Regions:
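FAD-dinucleotide binding site
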Residues: 1-504
């Protein structure tokens, strides 16, 4: 059925790997993967560090039911819930005078936060403004009913939540996040913080390759991947085959192309990448959907200086102290006032992970490692040294997702601009017609950009599919959303050829 079918997959991230493995599993052997970098995984990036491995990209499997990553991993008992991260009472908050905030206050704050989230899906759909407006409104409603601290401290806590939400949504500001657009996102029920028992998220790809399934043959995925192949053009104007060119002057023809690079790459390159160009509607969709930067800065300490029951550390500025602090800084160091959160890392007893997002993260990507390490350490000292003897980190590793031309950011979001432009995932279902009147491009509802060119002689379709987390209506920004997209697009090809064979 598949002997002469040529499929080229652009990108060896979660979507590309999932698509390739599905096709190989079903007997389509003529699969080629062009990967611009020197590794598989994309925004899943597991590296050795300190006593084990850490994740520079995706870290946890979020939820169980409806989560394809959980479904795949649980067959082999590869996941476990975090021991302490999900317990609100295990998070320490300190104010800008270096005093630990009473745990009953910080615990109640997190209870309110999660309480707002629990009922949020039913309230967001008809909210006209930003998610920042929505959450602020709901937060002060909850505070009025339960004044768990004084009003000034409540405002300071809200500022901490704002920064935390910018990490969750990968946004520069929660004022740009569309509340009604956020309603599209589906939360998978079950434990939201499942780790890989010290193996790292890269284990998911081993599962996809059947390495944990003794009764199945291991799929030869890595034999199909060509590294450092940067695609420079995809020409689908011909009625015969799609022509793909790379920056090192390699040219390859294919019957089908599955395009899986990030929305950040699309934003930067789509005008020069596709022939013919994408329609104005598709361009507006790429423009309207957001794609932000979230970076991790991970520190190794010579020993564990925090108690066993501590999940992480959070900093809460007063307006007055923050103003004075900013005035004391040299120009270019304002980013220090945006450091707010350090979390422990499962299976890494001497490691803390700091987070930055938005313009601040992009700025810090350009700073020297020594400046970043010293800056984070100074914040830890300022807020927590009254209560803990904090040694200086002995090692640091960090992500630079915006700086990397193969990603240009971390993950996607729904913005107010997308609402203003009236562009949503459903627009991916609308066809684009070429000058001859034949349907050459259509976008699959909920998932992927598909380019279809009919071959009158051979009576089969050439299809260019866009996969990846940003193409998923309900599970965008997640690995399981990316994996699902790759599998569904592979299944689209498989289903087509099965139907075609049945008609012969």
């Amino acid at each position: 059925m598949f002997e002469e079918v040529q499929v080229l997959i652009v990108g060896a991230g979660a979507a590309g790997i999932a698509a390739a493995c599905r096709l190989l599993e079903q007997g389509l052997e003529n699969v080629t993967v062009f990967e611009a970098g020197d590794r598989i995984g994309g925004r899943v990036h597991t590296v050795e560090f300190a006593d084990n491995v850490i994740e520079l990209g995706a870290e946890y499997v979020h939820g169980e039911r409806g989560n394809i990553s959980h479904e795949l991993a649980s067959r082999h008992n590869l996941l476990e819930g975090s021991k302490i991260l999900t317990k609100n009472e295990n998070w320490i908050f300190a104010d800008s005078q270096g005093e630990i905030i009473p745990r009953e206050q910080s615990t109640e704050l997190l209870n309110i936060y999660h309480g707002i989230y629990a009922v949020m899906p039913n309230k967001l759909t008809d909210f006209e403004g930003s998610f920042g407006e929505y959450f602020t409104q709901e937060y002060f409603k909850a505070f009025k009913e339960n004044p768990f601290t004084n009003f000034t401290r409540a405002e300071e806590f809200l500022e901490w939540i704002r920064r935390y939400e910018c990490i969750i949504d990968s946004c520069d500001s929660w004022s740009e996040v569309c509340a009604s657009g956020l309603a599209e996102y589906w939360i998978c029920p079950g434990n939201p913080l499942l780790n890989w028992k010290g193996r790292g998220y890269k284990t998911l790809f081993e599962v996809l390759m059947n390495k944990f399934t003794p009764e199945a043959n291991e799929l030869p995925l890595l034999e199909k991947v060509h590294f450092k192949k940067v695609v420079s053009s995809i020409d689908y104007s011909s009625e015969n085959q799609i022509i793909i060119k790379t920056t090192d002057n390699l040219e390859r023809n294919a019957d089908h192309v599955i395009f899986t690079p990030s929305l950040g790459v699309l934003k930067e390159q789509h005008n020069n990448l596709f022939t013919p160009p994408l329609s104005e509607l598709k361009k507006r969709t790429i423009q309207g959907l957001g794609f932000g930067t979230v970076d991790k800065i991970i520190f190794e300490f010579p020993y564990k200086w925090w108690p066993e029951d501590v999940a992480g550390f959070n900093v809460v500025w007063s307006k007055e102290d923050k103003t004075k602090f900013l005035q004391s800084l040299d120009k270019g160091n304002e980013w220090l006032a945006e450091v707010f959160h350090f979390s422990t890392v499962d299976h890494q007893p001497r490691v803390l992970s700091g987070w930055l997002t938005g313009p601040c993260a992009k700025h810090v990507e350009n700073l020297a490692d020594s400046i970043v390490l010293d800056g984070f350490y100074d914040i830890l000292q300022r807020f927590f040294s009254k209560n803990f003897n904090i040694p200086k980190p002995i090692n640091m590793i960090r992500s630079k997702w915006n700086q990397d031309k193969n990603f240009r950011g971390s993950y996607s979001l729904r913005t107010l601009e997308s609402k203003k432009l009236d562009v949503w995932a459903k627009d991916l279902a609308e066809p684009i017609i070429n000058p001859t009147g034949k349907p050459v491009i259509s976008l699959l509802y909920r998932y992927h950009l598909i380019v279809i060119s009919k071959n009158e002689t051979n009576h089969f379709l050439q299809i260019l599919l866009f996969g990846g987390e940003a193409t998923n209506e309900h599970y965008y920004s997640t690995v399981h959303g990316a994996v699902e997209s790759g599998i569904r697009e592979a299944d689209r090809l498989i289903d087509y050829y099965r139907k075609r064979k049945s008609q012969l």
